[in-house]
A protein has these predicted regions:
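Carbohydrate transferase catalytic cores enriched for Leloir-type hexosyltransferases
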Residues: 1-166
Length: 166
């Protein structure tokens, strides 16, 4: 939901800017919010740590070289450590650092190995709370000036529940 809401607003508020949305599989046209978006499908579908590596470290740098973006924005924290483009990564939290046992072994290993690299490589990091900002900064030895807190918003589709329905 975060990605949908943020990108819908950014693209509609900036019609003069060209956006490239990069998908790892066929996508719904509902994700192409406006005419200033060019969609790309980059394979393989990144649904496993080995495929994440192929997608972000091998395939994505090739596509970014063709697109030549001013900024690469990652709403889920994953970026390419091999790409030289400016990047902004949203790292929602780093719970996998504190509770690695809560994830499948290979997922946990990937996150704990790469997210520190992503955080250091990103030009800027967005996170969802002051606690997460301090956690990322302290755990990864990142200057807090590099991290902005952007609280989660609420979609216009959410409505107050009638007292009788609670």
């Amino acid at each position: 939901r975060y990605t949908f809401e943020v990108l819908k607003r950014i693209t509609s508020k900036n019609p003069q800017v060209e956006f490239h949305f990069i998908f790892d599989r066929p996508f719904s046209k509902k994700f192409i919010f406006s005419s200033n978006i060019t969609p790309h499908i980059l394979t393989p579908a990144a649904r496993h740590p080995i495929l994440w590596y192929i997608w972000f470290e091998l395939q994505l740098p090739k596509l970014l070289k063709k697109i030549n973006p001013d900024i690469f924005f990652s709403p889920d924290g994953f970026i390419s450590t091999k790409s030289k483009y400016n990047s902004i990564a949203t790292i929602h939290d780093i719970n996998f650092e504190h509770r690695p046992q809560d994830l499948p072994w290979l997922h946990s290993l990937y996150y704990r190995n790469f997210f520190q690299k992503y955080a250091r490589r990103a030009n800027h990091i967005i996170t969802v709370s002051k606690f997460c900002k301090e956690d990322i900064a302290n755990r990864y030895d990142i200057n807090q000036q590099k991290i902005s807190v952007v609280y989660n918003g609420v979609s216009n589709t959410f409505r107050e529940v009638d007292e009788g329905k609670k």
